[in-house]
Amino acid sequence: METEPVSVQKVPAPPGSPCRQQDSALTPTPTMPPPEEPSEDYEHSQSPAEQAIQEEFQFLRCPSCQAQAKCPKLLPCLHTLCSGCLEAPGLQCPICKAPGQADANGEALDNVFFESLQRRLAVFRQIVDAQAACTRCKGLADFWCFECEQLICSKCFEAHQWYLKHEARPLADLRDNSVSSFLDSTRKSNIFCSNTNHRNPALTDIYCRGCAKPLCCTCALLDRNHSHLHCDIGEEIQQWHEELGTMTQTLEEQGRTFDSAHAQMCSAIGQLDHARADIEKQIRARVRQVVDYVQAQERELLEAVNDRYQRDYQEIAGQLSCLEAVLQRIRTSGALVKRMKLYASDQEVLDMHSFLRKALCSLRQEEPQNQKVQLLTRGFEEFKLCLQDFISCITQRINAAVASPEAASNQPEAASTHPVTTSTPEDLEQPKEVQSVQAQALELSKTQPVAMVKTVPGAHPVPVYAFSMQGPTYREEASQTVGSMKRKCSHEDCSRKIIKMESTEENEDRLATSSPEQSWPSTFKATSPPHLDGTSNPESTVPEKKILLPNNNHVTSDTGETEERVVVISSSEDSDTENLSSHELDDSSSESSSLQLEGPNSLKALDESLAEPHLEDRTLVFFDLKIDNETQKISQLAAVNRESKFRVLIQPEAFSVYSKAVSLEAGLRHFLSFLTTMHRPILACSRLWGPGLPIFFQTLSDINKLWEFQDTISGFLAVLPLIRERIPGASSFKLGNLAKTYLARNMSERSALASVLAMRDLCCLLEISPGLPLAQHIYSFSSLQCFASLQPLIQASVLPQSEARLLALHNVSFVELLNAYRTNRQEGLKKYVHYLSLQTTPLSSSASTQVAQFLQALSTHMEGLLEGHAPAGAEGKAESKGCLA
């Protein structure tokens, strides 16, 4: 006769209590022992239902060893591992490599939720298999007691109900239910008072927020200090569920940010792979053109490229692994909270809530470290330059080896007749057809007037006089064929330089009517060479915007001269009127001249067979700006190419009545529009590594035009280092002195337009044109932006300007330094030391001390920034200058 299940519930007596001792048949047994690992034969013989259960609860397995987690431990990263995989407390998680900082005792939290779920699943498997044994007599079980959590046969069930009267159900009914129904029915909602002094555990539904413990009615009445903090424990648990759910929703939004950063990292790796493949293809293509002599060099170049790739890949891969670890923690936390909401009991939520909340709060503080980091995916340009020099050296040796003895014997005679054609290494690089064309052009020059050049020992040749080359004879017959070729004459080998020119009656009239104070032209304009980007269209000039200024003594040039675009900007801020003289408000006398000088070569690629097309197609735009010393804001901005000029002049308020006043933002927009008329030009500046460009970048950023400016240009060209290479013997490399010496021009140091015109004319005179030889002097926008971001360290005297430049050349920004220090305050900044100048030679003991002092100063400054106040500038100045000056 079957006994109906009794619905009356009774609190289970603790082991050893008198109630338990009354029932001799009810011996103390453990409640639901942990299940054993199923054998391989059992796994192969699983039913479809069992396989579905195993797939649904796969998360109960240890993610490290994929075995049934015994004594599961919950780590702060919210990964659950078995006790076997958790080798020692405080170690890193083997899944996400997160540091194992657990609770105050240094141990991971027992995952009571997983352990309870494993036990209940094991019981359900026994019930479904119809092989459940009675936990008392080991006979075939027929009932399941939800209070004792034991399997009971019919005989033991009668005694069990006689003494305990617990709720029990036949196993036949449970077999028809699903695993979810069984797990839901076994979720206990009975919570007992946390006071251990009770003789019998007392059920309670009161929770004290002050004690953070459940209390019975008696204990709640005695706890008068926290009477206002008592609440219903069910409502409190529900509030905890909602709080954890809200935190997981916030983490999901944060996860999308990490997904975006992860995608950028993967894209960067793809770009890095593409860059490596591209440079390897170029290297192999050029090396295949030579014989076995160059194979050893090929291997060296490929190894260097691979080393650079591995270094850059490791940097990106390290950040990628950190992002993947945080993403995995976010997904794990969300899954754990959802599963606890589905399957965890209230007691389990009470036990684990504080730990979960602390872990989720720590996870919410994570931020992607790559949001403002510029990725290094174009770091192979230096290998292209090495390859170019290598090929040039080989070509020179091959041409020298095949030269005939007759040519070698005739060379001195030719040099005495035509000094310009003295054989140089550059001449050996040119094909015979090019050299023949140059010889024809030189013969043609015999019929043209020439300008002699005086030679000073140790200095660059200085022109004595010059005429404009206006006649069609030379321009059509020689300039079009030889204009794009490079012809150099070393001033150690020749005593003079021949410049082929033609003097016309019009030029003589201009010379007669020119100012007596000026004995030669102050500037020149090349009329024959085409545009810097390779196009030649003299009629496609930019329309002029004329704005009349007071006291304008500018002498307009002839109608054939290109017009200029001038935008005058009025500023509401006060400035010193003495800084704006009358000759600064006009176009300056150096801009227009009745005498024009034209060199024999245009600003095109010097060696078309070796220069890269994408560099040749770029337009050189000479660019300069002036910063007001008092306001530290832009006072002038000027740019010029071969066809048009652009100037922004910021005047004080007193001059606004004479000009068409526009805002600074409008003026910068006009400047961007001027740049967009060309295809990604190269901005040529006299000084890149100064305070001017950072202020310019900040101004563009204030009007949200910085990224548009980045997309408009292709890079920055340092002009003065190029001039230093061409004329190493010059007495001074200041732009004003160079203009006075080689252009016979008195340049105004306070005029931005005069500076850019001087740079343009110097580059034209020295035959500086776009092409591969300029690549080593062209810097990317990202490098200059990184240098701008390092300005706070320079201003705080923590980082010298020269060392900031070295960091910027490796695309190391201030944000990257700060994040590296925040991540690892002991070792985070050391990896950047090898970029600095001290690493060019082996470190001595004194140099090591200087490096340590520099790192200490930089760390002190970073610590001050993280704490909300920067350290004293004198402290950083003393340490950094002693290290890197």
From Swiss-Prot:
Record-listed Phosphothreonine modification sites: T535
Residue numbers spanned by region Sumo interaction motif (SIM): 566-572
Biased composition (Polar residues): 407-425, 512-526, 550-559
Cell division found in the keyword field: no
Coiled coil feature spans: 295-331
GO biological process terms, semicolon-separated: branching involved in mammary gland duct morphogenesis; cell fate commitment; cellular response to interleukin-4; cellular response to leukemia inhibitory factor; cellular senescence; chromatin remodeling; circadian regulation of gene expression; DNA damage response, signal transduction by p53 class mediator
Location of the motif Nuclear localization signal: 486-500
Binding site for Zn(2+) 2: C77, H79, C93, C96
Cross-link Glycyl lysine isopeptide (Lys-Gly) (interchain with G-Cter in SUMO2): residue positions: K70, K165, K384, K486, K488, K497, K500
Zn finger intervals (RING-type): 62-97
Keyword Phosphoprotein: yes
Protein origin, superkingdom: Eukaryota
Record-listed cross-link Glycyl lysine isopeptide (Lys-Gly) (interchain with G-Cter in ubiquitin), residues: K384, K486
Residue location of crosslink Glycyl lysine isopeptide (Lys-Gly) (interchain with G-Cter in SUMO): K70, K165, K500
Annotated GO CC locations: chromosome, telomeric region; cytosol; early endosome membrane; endoplasmic reticulum membrane; nuclear matrix; nucleolus; nucleoplasm; nucleus
Modified residues (N6-acetyllysine): K497, K525
Pfam families, sorted: ANCHR-like_BBOX, PML_C, PML_CC
Residue numbers binding Zn(2+) 3: C134, C137, C156, H160
SMART domains the record matches: BBOX, RING
List of residues binding Zn(2+) 1: C62, C65, C82, C85
PTM text: Ubiquitinated; mediated by RNF4, RNF111, UHRF1, UBE3A/E6AP, BCR(KLHL20) E3 ubiquitin ligase complex, SIAH1 or SIAH2 and leading to subsequent proteasomal degradation. 'Lys-6'-, 'Lys-11'-, 'Lys-48'- and 'Lys-63'-linked polyubiquitination by RNF4 is polysumoylation-dependent. Ubiquitination by RNF111 is polysumoylation-dependent. Ubiquitination by BCR(KLHL20) E3 ubiquitin ligase complex requires CDK1/2-mediated phosphorylation at Ser-528 which in turn is recognized by prolyl-isopeptidase PIN1 and PIN1-catalyzed isomerization further potentiates PML interaction with KLHL20.
Topology relative to the membrane: Peripheral membrane protein
Zinc finger (B box-type): 129-171, 188-239
Functional description taken from the UniProt entry: Functions via its association with PML-nuclear bodies (PML-NBs) in a wide range of important cellular processes, including tumor suppression, transcriptional regulation, apoptosis, senescence, DNA damage response, and viral defense mechanisms. Acts as the scaffold of PML-NBs allowing other proteins to shuttle in and out, a process which is regulated by SUMO-mediated modifications and interactions. Inhibits EIF4E-mediated mRNA nuclear export by reducing EIF4E affinity for the 5' 7-methylguanosine (m7G) cap of target mRNAs.
The name this protein goes by in its record: Protein PML
Source organism of the structure: Mus musculus (Mouse)
Gene it is expressed from: Pml
